[in-house]
Amino acid sequence: HPAYAARAAAQSTVTLQLPARRGNFYDAQGRLLTGLEERWQVVCFPGQGNYDRLYACTDAAGQALLYRSRSRAAPFLLEVSCDPARLGLTGYPAARRYAAVPLCQHLLGYLDSTGHGAAGLEKALDAVLSGTGENSSLVCAVTAQGTLRTGETARLLQADSGALGVQLTISRPVQRAV
């Protein structure tokens, strides 16, 4: 029966939302003020056996997520700081918004927990920087145990949020020195 087949297919498909792309701030020479640290999102599948390798490549929040999700029956996304290709994994770029030592944070401001501007230029220019807020997503055909079905790969569904960057008249080297 086609309706049962469609329902079964829907139950065995997991869609994971990648972080929405947000425009960056640039200095007067076009150098990045935000998005300086390269990061990746990696899809983790139950029983994949890469938890040990990923543990060293993520921060404390990621390590806690790995620990909580070790017996999970569905795939999940994990942010890592090392290139996933070196680990034999597929990663999706997702730069860390602010450097460990933020640049001109009094001017740029910061984001709230939903990824929208909460203060400074991040708030004032939120509509430009976030665009439509659309996310790209990964669609995974999984088994009942949450592992990727044999012969399948995660499909990336690209979405363009239309987010734009903003160039400021300040200088990154001067801001680093301050």
Question: What does each model-found stretch correspond to?
Answer:
Residues 1-15:
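Aromatic-capped interface at the extracytoplasmic side
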Residues 11-16, 45, 112, 161-169:
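Second-shell loop/turn segments in exported
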Residues 34-39, 56, 61-163:
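Small/polar-residue-rich segments within soluble enzyme cores
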Residues 41-51:
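A short, polar/charged loop-to-alpha-helix boundary motif
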